């Protein structure tokens, strides 16, 4: 779908054009504004409150119209703190929805929900803006061909492949490598697909947003020396923001991603961390607007809000937006309406395991819990499907045998089971991989492994051709040839020690 970017922001230019109203009521982040008869703003129009508070400080608050209440009154939700606002203050109707800067100038920069840069690097050098509210692409514009989105990470491409233009849920607690995996994907899409990424921080910790920015600069994903060569744009609406900002920041990030897809015709990665906070903010806004709550106190419009965001994330004939969304599961209850509504939209799930992270196997993707709708013979081909299933079966059998090994030891197993365990341990280590963005921590150069190479490697392990190699030869290597070379080096080293 072609976007219709404008070349000016929705701030009204001349005094005659200004549609002025006055604040009638303030309820936290919600404002009621009275306009002259016949001058009512449309739903989703941006309103701007400008003035001074009681101590003379300049106030500039942008709001979004949510309801038309009748009697020339509208109800709007503020995108920033409403401290210092007073009844009777003048409100300007901009006559258009919130619009944000789009295009190459956004790369390497950090924005808030309004598209204003918050990184102290000066204004954004672009006159092209786009409204955050747009309809999803029409059916005729969609690219319905099912194709794999190759990430270069062995465990993902083999066992839970991503769909081009699909939506992936990323599950994992603190410290299991979510951020590093996200940064590696940003790096790989730029190198292998010539694509860019947009990161939407929705309602998460400000410290995490800052850490991510610093780590991206350190790993080269954001190029400080030449900001235009950066591979990602960052949009933050963190925990301290009002619910209106947290509810809309996902749309701001999505709008920037849509421009890269529709106008620049690129493959785009859109990260949303965390999709649950988008629902949570919508729930807060819904209560403030006086709507009757639905199940578990969520907003009655939960499915509609989620659908309007998710349906814009898709492949068109121009390009694709592939979305990776971190999903927080409240109280580990997968039947909670928020995660349950999210699951309906996901094509794949990538589950990060603390047990694997503790073993030092990175990326710590759980091969048995991670799933994908793409892993079907008619989509990925018979060879890929069979290899993935055999890897899972071997890993599952190893998991079942672990209790017996812990109690009786490896010697009590049958010959066949011992062989299964040996191959499963090689597979477990071969699923690890050195990352480009982790070179600064590991000292090992990063590896991008193509899908064909990945399948070949696991087939050789499963067939028994590599049974003679030590399992440590498979740890943190790229393709299977590197594992063979590493085994030879280990053999030489052991002989020298003797």
From Swiss-Prot:
In which compartments does the protein localize? Plastid, Chloroplast thylakoid membrane
**Membrane topology reported for the UniProt record:** Peripheral membrane protein
Q: Biological process GO annotation list?
A: proton motive force-driven mitochondrial ATP synthesis
The reaction(s) catalysed by this protein are: ATP + H2O + 4 H(+)(in) = ADP + phosphate + 5 H(+)(out)
What positions does the entry give for ATP binding?
172-179
Write the record's keywords in alphabetical order, separated by commas. Answer: ATP synthesis, ATP-binding, CF(1), Chloroplast, Hydrogen ion transport, Ion transport, Membrane, Nucleotide-binding, Plastid, Thylakoid, Translocase, Transport
Tell me how this protein assembles.
F-type ATPases have 2 components, CF(1) - the catalytic core - and CF(0) - the membrane proton channel. CF(1) has five subunits: alpha(3), beta(3), gamma(1), delta(1), epsilon(1). CF(0) has four main subunits: a(1), b(1), b'(1) and c(9-12).
What role does this protein play?
Produces ATP from ADP in the presence of a proton gradient across the membrane. The catalytic sites are hosted primarily by the beta subunits.
Protein's recorded name: ATP synthase subunit beta, chloroplastic
State the organism of origin. Caryota mitis
């Amino acid at each position: 779908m072609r976007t219709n970017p404008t070349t000016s922001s929705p701030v009204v230019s001349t005094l005659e054009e200004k549609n002025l109203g006055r604040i009638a009521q303030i309820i936290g982040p919600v404002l009621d504004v009275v306009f002259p008869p016949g001058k009512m703003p449309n739903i989703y129009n941006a309103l701007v409150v400008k003035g001074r508070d009681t101590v003379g400080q300049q106030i500039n608050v942008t709001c979004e119209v949510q309801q038309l209440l009748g009697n020339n009154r509208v109800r709007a939700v503020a995108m920033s703190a409403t401290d210092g606002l007073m009844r009777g203050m003048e409100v300007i109707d901009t006559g258009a929805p919130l619009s944000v800067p789009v295009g190459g100038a956004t790369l390497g920069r950090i924005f808030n929900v309004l598209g204003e840069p918050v990184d102290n690097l000066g204004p954004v050098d672009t006159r092209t803006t786009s409204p955050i509210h747009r309809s999803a692409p029409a059916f005729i514009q969609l690219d319905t061909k099912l194709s794999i989105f190759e990430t270069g990470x062995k465990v993902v491409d083999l066992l839970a492949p991503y769909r081009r233009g699909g939506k992936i849920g990323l599950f994992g607690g603190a410290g299991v490598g979510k951020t590093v995996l996200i940064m590696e994907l940003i790096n790989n899409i730029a190198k292998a697909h010539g694509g860019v990424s947009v990161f939407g921080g929705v309602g998460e910790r400000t410290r995490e947003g800052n850490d991510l920015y610093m780590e991206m600069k350190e790993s080269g994903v954001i190029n400080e020396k030449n900001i235009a060569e950066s591979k990602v744009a960052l949009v933050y609406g963190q925990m301290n923001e009002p619910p209106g900002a947290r509810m809309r920041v996902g749309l701001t990030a999505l709008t920037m991603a849509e421009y890269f897809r529709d106008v620049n015709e690129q493959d785009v990665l859109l990260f949303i961390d965390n999709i649950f906070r988008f629902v949570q903010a919508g729930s807060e806004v819904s209560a403030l607007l006086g709507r009757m709550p639905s199940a578990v106190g969520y907003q009655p419009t939960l499915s509609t809000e989620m659908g309007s965001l998710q349906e814009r994330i898709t492949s068109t004939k121009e390009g694709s937006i592939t979305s990776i969304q971190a999903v927080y599961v409240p109280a580990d209850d997968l039947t909670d309406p928020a995660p349950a509504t999210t699951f309906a939209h996901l094509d794949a799930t990538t589950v990060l395991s603390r047990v694997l992270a503790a073993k030092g196997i990175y990326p710590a993707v759980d091969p048995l819990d991670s799933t994908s709708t793409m892993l079907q013979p008619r989509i990925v081909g018979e060879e890929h499907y069979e290899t993935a299933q055999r890897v899972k079966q071997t890993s599952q059998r190893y998991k079942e045998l672990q209790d017996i090994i812990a109690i009786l030891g490896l010697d009590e197993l049958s010959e066949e089971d011992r062989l299964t365990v040996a191959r499963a341990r090689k597979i477990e280590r071969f699923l690890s991989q050195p990352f480009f963005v982790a070179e600064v921590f590991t000292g090992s150069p990063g590896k991008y492994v193509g899908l064909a190479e990945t399948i070949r490697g696991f087939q050789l392990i499963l067939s028994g051709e590599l049974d003679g190699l030590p399992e440590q030869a498979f740890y943190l290597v790229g393709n299977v040839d590197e594992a063979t070379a590493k085994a030879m080096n280990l053999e030489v080293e052991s002989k020298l020690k003797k």
